[in-house]
UniProtKB/Swiss-Prot annotation:
Pathway entry: Polyol metabolism; glycerol degradation via glycerol kinase pathway; sn-glycerol 3-phosphate from glycerol: step 1/1
Top EC category: transferase
InterPro entries: ATPase_NBD, Carb_kinase_FGGY, Carb_kinase_FGGY_CS, FGGY_C, FGGY_N, Glycerol_kin
Family classification: Belongs to the FGGY kinase family.
Annotated residues for binding of ATP: T12, T13, S14, T265, G308, Q312, G411
Binding site for sn-glycerol 3-phosphate: T12, R82, E83, Y134, D243
HAMAP family, A to Z: Glycerol_kin
Activity regulation information from UniProt: Inhibited by fructose 1,6-bisphosphate (FBP).
GO CC terms of this entry: cytosol
Protein name per its UniProtKB record: Glycerol kinase
Annotated binding of glycerol, by residue: R82, E83, Y134, D243, Q244
GO biological process: glycerol catabolic process; glycerol metabolic process; glycerol-3-phosphate metabolic process
Length: 499
């Protein structure tokens, strides 16, 4: 067995696998997209078999690209779209329903009922989360209540529940391991992040059988070995983390006060608060950043549902661009005198508003508004939403000194225009790393460090390199006016607003 690391990044619209060598260099890549399904308004589903096939295919592509065999891989690390809920038959490993994706809003009535019963403070205290259909627990309750015969099978222990990582590990190990890691468990709405255990009281409220839940491990742990029949070798799976927590690790945000923001389909900002669990008073989430050697590190998180998806909307629904990479050049052509705001509440609004019923809108249209102004508004909406998150974090985090530097990653950060606009709106420096795929790098480090191949946290942090720092360059009066316009626009989109 060689010293190579295989990392798998299973995302919302595609799966990517990478092979890293001992020096943390990428030597092989495989990527495949897979379809999403929208069976009803507000519903988003994946076929779990599509996910599984994309994982196997990208692994084989990455190995071929690297020119190595599976037997040369020392360890596997997995990172995944969080909250997406998968149910499968314990005996066959076959999914019993399409995966309900994190973006899916069908459980909104379940959340509203729990809120009416005054239960949100209890859930928040135990899990650090809010009652929103974004999280797995209410999706799971909906499935158990709605799919005929499912609850009876779950009670008998015949059905497994898991986030995507858990499903993949089950398949990769030939059904021998039903496990997950602490970061993914912390996003389910049924995991007590103080006790680091599934919470019986919350399970009882949601009527979820404990028999269907996976075992929860540290992020760097022994998750099992791959079935030799799949890849031709038994490879240990040694690292697992939800995608946003993996990006915290990949960005080397190991110290309290360090902050990262990932820009993919959505946008997710996490602020490391160390071993202190900070309870937000500004509608942020308290979550597990990572758990290593039995020690839990916490984070404040703000979740934005639509970031890169707004660019996809410009491309797919409006036809303003042919490929996503064209959007920055188009935005640069926008009339600077027009102030157009896009509130991309296509599936509701996330932090700090948490309004499942909010819907998107565009404000400030004139006869001269065209594709360029739409493009700029779409990119600026990401900056404004990030400002909302950073503003809330500064209010919650006692350690904030007003000198926050934001480390960024994800597909959107390749755009210099977007990153400069982000720095301008935040009035804070934005650091873009040399290696942009920090999510998959984080998964690779978890596995490689567990295998003893890559360095410890400190040495890994020293290895992090900045490509460019974007410093704010906007007049304060202009910035304040722009933010005021944004907040007025958001206020008009909220489902419950002052008239």
């Amino acid at each position: 067995m060689g010293g190579y690391i295989l990392a798998i990044d299973q995302g919302t619209t595609s799966t990517r696998s990478m092979v890293f060598d001992r020096d943390m260099r990428v030597i092989g890549v495989g990527q495949r997209e897979f379809p999403q399904h929208f069976p009803a308004s507000g519903w988003v589903e994946h076929d779990a078999e599509d996910i599984w096939k994309s994982v196997l295919e990208t692994i084989r592509l990455a190995l071929a690209d690297a020119g190595i065999a599976a037997s040369d891989i020392a360890a596997i690390g997995i990172t995944n779209q969080r909250e997406t809920t998968v149910l499968w038959d314990r005996n066959t490993g076959e999914a019993v329903h399409r995966a309900v994706v994190w973006q899916d809003r069908r459980a909104a009535p379940v959340c509203e009922d729990l809120k009416r019963r005054g239960l949100e403070p209890l859930f928040s205290k135990k899990t650090g989360l809010l009652l929103d259909p974004y999280f797995s627990g209410t999706k799971l309750k909906w499935l158990l209540d709605s799919v005929s015969g499912l609850r009876e099978k779950a009670v008998k222990g015949e059905i497994c529940f898991g986030t995507v990582d858990s499903f993949l590990i089950y398949r990769l190990t030939g059904g021998r391991r039903h496990v997950t890691d602490a970061t993914n468990a912390s996003r389910t709405l049924i995991y007590n992040i103080e006790d680091n255990a599934w919470d019986d009281e919350l399970l009882s409220i949601l009527n979820i059988p404990r028999a269907m839940l996976p075992e929860v491990l540290d992020c760097a742990a022994d998750f099992g070995v791959t079935d030799k029949a799949l890849l031709g070798a038994e490879i240990p799976i040694l690292g697992v983390a939800g995608d946003q927590q993996a990006a915290v690790i990949g960005n080397a945000c190991f110290e309290p006060g360090m902050m990262k923001s990932t820009y993919g389909t959505g946008c997710f900002a996490l602020l490391n608060t160390g071993t202190d669990r900070v309870a937000s008073t500004n509608r942020l989430l308290t979550t597990i950043a990572y758990r290593l050697d039995g020690v839990t590190t916490y984070a404040l998180e703000g979740s934005i549902f639509i970031a890169g998806a707004a660019v996809q909307w410009l491309r797919d629904e409006l036809g303003f661009i042919s490929v996503a990479s064209e959007v920055s050049a188009l935005a640069e052509k926008a009339d600077p005198k027009q102030r157009v705001y896009l509130v991309p509440a296509f599936t509701g609004l996330g932090a700090p508003y948490w309004d499942a019923e909010a819907r998107g809108a565009i404000f400030g249209l004139t006869r001269g508004t065209g594709p360029a102004e739409f493009a700029r508004a779409a990119l600026e909406s990401v900056a404004y939403q990030t400002f909302d998150l950073l503003d809330a974090m500064r209010k919650d985090w006692a350690g904030d000194n007003g000198k926050t530097v934001l480390r960024v990653d994800g597909g959107m950060v390749a755009s210099d225009w977007t990153m400069q606009r982000l720095a301008d709106i935040l009035a804070a420096p934005v650091d873009r790393p040399v290696f942009l795929e920090t999510t998959i790098l984080g998964a690779a480090w978890l596995a490689a460090s567990r295998a003893g191949i890559w360095p410890d946290r400190k040495a890994f942090a020293d290895h992090w390199r900045r490509d460019r720092r974007f410093s704010p360059d906007m007049e304060e009066s202009e910035r304040k006016n722009a933010i005021a316009g944004w907040r007025d626009s958001v206020g008009r989109c909220l489902s419950k607003r002052d008239n």
